[in-house]
Amino acid sequence: MTISDKIRIYELSRDLNLDNKDILGAAQKLSISVKSHSSSISAEEAEKIKNLINKKNPDKKILSIKKPSIKKDNYKQNKEDKSSLISSVEEKPFKDNPEKKPLLKKPLNKPESLKIISNQPKSLNKPTITNSSQSQANLTNQNLNSKTSQNLNQDKRNFRNNLTPPIKSPTKPPIQLIAKPKNTTKNVQSNESSQNILNSGGGRQISNKPDQNSSKSKTKNINNRMSPPELVGAPIRREGPNKQNNKQKTSFKQTVPNRPGMLNRPGLRNKPSDQGRPGSFNRQTNTNRPGAPSSNKPGMPNRPGLRNKPSDQGRPGSFNRQVNTNRSGAPIRPGMPNRPGSKFNGPKSPGMRKPVSPNELLKLQKTNKSENDKQVINNNEKQNSETTKQKVKAPNSRPHTAPNSKKLPHRTFSNNSKKPGKTDWDDSAKLEALRNKNPQKQRQKVRIIGENDDSLTSETSGYSGEKFSILSASLARPKKEKSDESKSQKTIKQFKKKKKETTRQRQKRRAMELKAAKEAKQIRPEMIIVPEDNLTVQELADKLSLESSEIIKSLFFKGITATVTQSLDLATIETVAEEFGVPVLQDDIQEAAEKTVDMIESEDLDNLIKRPPVITVMGHVDHGKTSLLDSIRESRVASGEAGGITQHIGAYQVEFEHESKKKKLTFLDTPGHEAFTAMRARGTKVTDVAVLVVAADDGCRPQTLEAISHARAAKVPIVVAINKIDKEGASPDRVKQELSEKNLIAEDWGGDTVMVPVSAIKKQNINKLLEMILLVSEVEDLQANPDRFAKGTVIEAHLDKAKGPVATLLVQNGTLKSGDVLAAGSVLGKIRAMVDEHGNRIKDAGPSFPVEALGFSEVPTAGDEFEVYPDEKTARAIVGERATDARATKLAQQMASRRVSLSSLSTQANDGELKELNLILKADVQGSVEAILGSLEQLPKNEVQVRVLLSAPGEITETDIDLAAASGSVIIGFNTSLASGAKKAADANDVDVREYEVIYKLLEDIQLAMEGLLEPDLVEESLGKAEVRATFSVGKGAIAGCYIQTGKLQRNCSLRVIRSEKVIFEGNLDSLKRSKDDVKEVNTGFECGVGCDKFSSWIEGDIIEAFKFVTKKRTLTQE
């Protein structure tokens, strides 16, 4: 049993006749570490647990419910002595094996130890547990008599008078008893013990002639041993509902029970079975017989409304009449019987009701009723018994058993089982008849006790009329609203699965949706703006608020086949839009030059200082922009440009002494070629002052006007530099006149535009131009905050084979330092090094300072704004947000040339196949890539489509060669070189690699390549003309004698016979002879014979025209 003075939990529980869970709970209260019933504890710890269980301190709350095993011999002994018990208690014998159902007991402390004032509720001391075998040894069947019962009843009444119910309501919901629960005991204790328990727990009087001596001796024996009586069953508490109306109108106190310790519970007679729980087999007693005395037991209150209560758990006065007590804080053991009818076990039987508040019981226990009231109650019991005898049927024919439980015999209410003269159950006959009329409906209403117990009304709880109105509003639960059932039904209907719609219903619904969508799109916009001459059919339909099918149908009637993803040119868009009455406006190119980001923020206003101005030099090609900058910088940049034209944005900073102070100016040189429109717009976007260079001998040209529009879009002041005034034929006044037509009026003409005539070659008026620029910039009041993280714009970017991605950055606000983490568009970078325009390394760059920065993850897009962030995590998050848009933009650039126009699609339909020229474009900088792609868009593409498979800055690599070989593409390199191994790979794969330095030549060669893909045209070429002067018949045919008037005739050439200015025959010249000899051709002034196999009806005077078809190279034509 013990190992090294260790005791296991299950051994200790067996010794104490307790459940393992009780021992574990006691060990937990004593902080003894145990895990399960097989855990071992020391003898000292076991003694502590025993002392705690046997302790009678009322402050401790230890509730132990004992489930002792019942021996067979005890059961047999009880069975033999059962005859004495049957004389006072009517019950059916148990027929099941009693060994599997141990008797459940609930101990009780000695009544003398309880000194609790009823007005001050306190927690009830949890009774201790004693061994059932000891109780059985002391309580023998010989001492079972009525006197003992009466004496125990008197002790019980004393105990009840001092007992104050606990304030806490039961934690477990009431349990409805329908069938026998699992593990319910069937053992019958010794008759004396059983009778004592009936008297102490239920307060029932067994005999009309109690034996006082026997009662005293037995009570003394029990009290001395401190062995509380075992709980075998809970009696039925009944009331006389018609006897207490007068007192309940004025007081909550209910003092007179029907019998000592018995609660009056009308309506309990209709319960299907009360034997499904311990102690219910002694329910039918002879206490209602007419001769039974009604002793006044002050501790037991008369409790109306308890008739429907399934369980009296957690209330004083009822803890001895039940086993599965669930007081607040007491755990429910798995071995305890699960009563059917609880919210966990089954539907609630009719007549059961929710628990009554302990406060209500406290008020009901305070006073006793008089003897007169008792007599009235007994009389009413007789009347009710006679009335309800006819209407109440025995429920034993319909047994209810819980799962996995054995059947117990049900209590019968038949007339045969009643003793002569015994009064019937005290209840309202009408209410009983109503409940038994349709019990199934009643069960359905309260089938889930946990949810619907609030729906039990005052009638079902045993209170009716004025009795119910006496209860305090704080004690009674509110009624469940009648609308809850309808609401729940509506909710169920809402969650019901919808029927699957039929094909006809689906078609009808879709037709209605299409009609509604069409009506919603009837509102046409006032106008639409077409960006960059390109819109797909779907985009145009969205702008016009139309279905795409309407656009396709309109184009089809115009002889054009299109799809929803087809690109439309501006002319087609205007045609379609005018058909629907919507004008079209082309998106102005100047929008690219608008300043979209304000570099100065509100927190910078306190730390602003003056910054150098940024000046952008713009103008038409070959008007001397770079030469003017060379004169200012005193350098020779223009001579180094390929072809003498600028193809990059150059950023320079110049120091100029003005008013004995050195001033810094930042210049941006932009290309003047028409292909570099995006570069000019980008330069204008970041500028503070625009210098417009116009050649005095050439005047305003298209790019001059474009530069003016860029400057106006950027809202920057314009300074006009009239260059080349030293050349012959220069006319500055003519330039001023042309500019005045564009609303640029010179100051000497009364306008506000500064115009300075200069000569870049001879450096005339250069200082005056710089002074005017400084003057204009001072008016603009240019400021920045150097004490913040840098912000600015990417001017240019390219891929250097040694340095990696390199970007030209213009700092517009803040200070850029080495090591800063920045995000430029969707590109993340960390500055590894910075150099100025002279190639010198610098550590930081302030506002208006252009630098070349290294350290980007990839080549950034020119024109993107950059910003420095405090850490890489923040910058990476910003870059991630922009990644999607950047990928879409890059894809649009790569696929720009794939957009097929409608006219070229029509040509494809006519010719049978659309010619395509695949290109791979590599350039030195991102700006050059943009310029070339823009120029390719301007090429005629109605017959040959140019597809740019790859466009990126950087050198030509072997990967590019492999791509070109796989796709049959031509590689175009602009101002770039071939990587090591690329030339060898190109020769091996027979890939055509073209390198260019000037954009003119590049565009010309691409156009020639596109024309080379076109099939040549067959053109009719005239050979000569001859006149028929004689005819000769030869066999079946005829020969015409002709004279060559012009040109010549050739054998096998084509000829046309014209008679009276009408062509009567067209065919081949099959035979040509001169003087009977066959010849190949006959020239002008000679005579010859002409024969045709398919024509012989020659007439003198016919004209013969000889011609042949030759191929001619086709050229690209605009749409």
Swiss-Prot record:
Here the segments flagged for biased composition (Polar residues) are 116-153, 182-212, 242-257, 281-297, 319-328, 375-387
Region (G5) residue spans: 759-761
Is GTP-binding among this UniProt entry's keywords?
yes
* Positions bound to GTP: 619-626, 669-673, 723-726
Q: Where in the cell is it found?
A: Cytoplasm
Basic residues bias (residue ranges): 493-507
Alphabetically list the UniProt keywords: Cytoplasm, GTP-binding, Initiation factor, Nucleotide-binding, Protein biosynthesis
Q: Which Gene Ontology cellular-component terms appear in the entry?
A: cytosol
Region (G1) residue ranges read 619-626
**What does the function comment of this entry state?**
One of the essential components for the initiation of protein synthesis. Protects formylmethionyl-tRNA from spontaneous hydrolysis and promotes its binding to the 30S ribosomal subunits. Also involved in the hydrolysis of GTP during the formation of the 70S ribosomal complex.
- Protein's name in the database: Translation initiation factor IF-2
| Gene name of this polypeptide | infB
